[in-house]
Amino acid sequence: MEQAIINIEGTSTIEAAAAAKKLIETFGSSNIRTISVKRVNDKSDEVIVELDFVPGLAPHLHGFTLQVNGLTCGYAGTGPSNLYEVLQAAGVSEAQVAREDITQKSTKTIPLRLERAVTQYGDFQFA
């Protein structure tokens, strides 16, 4: 089954995060089944966030992935703060990932993968 990919890419971490948070709000954080954060490469602070949504949120829309590029981690700054805000909007709690996990260089939080169980009742799916 084909799956759509919505890609957010920008030169401003603030704008990329704002767009991601609005789309998460629109589709509902409770409909996210997988959250993945990975570094672009081993030497970079830049990360890619992938949010995998359940199918059926709109007619003809199978599950889809929201991919956010250009956010960063590993230092105290706007990029890591925006990454933290996107994770919070996606339903990640402070207990799961603390702000310090994102802003400190020495932590091994990234790569990060969180999954939520999905239950289906007839045509309805719940994450």
Q: Over which residues does each language-model region extend?
A:
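Charged, compositionally biased non-catalytic regions
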Residues: 1-3
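Amphipathic alpha-helical packing elements
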Residues: 10, 17, 26, 38, ...
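Charge-dense polyanion-binding interfaces
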Residues: 95-127
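Generic detection of short hydrophobic beta-strand segments and adjacent strand-loop junctions
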Residues: 6, 66-68, 110
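Extended, alpha-helix-rich binding/interface surfaces that flank or overlap catalytic cores
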Residues: 5-8, 14-24, 127
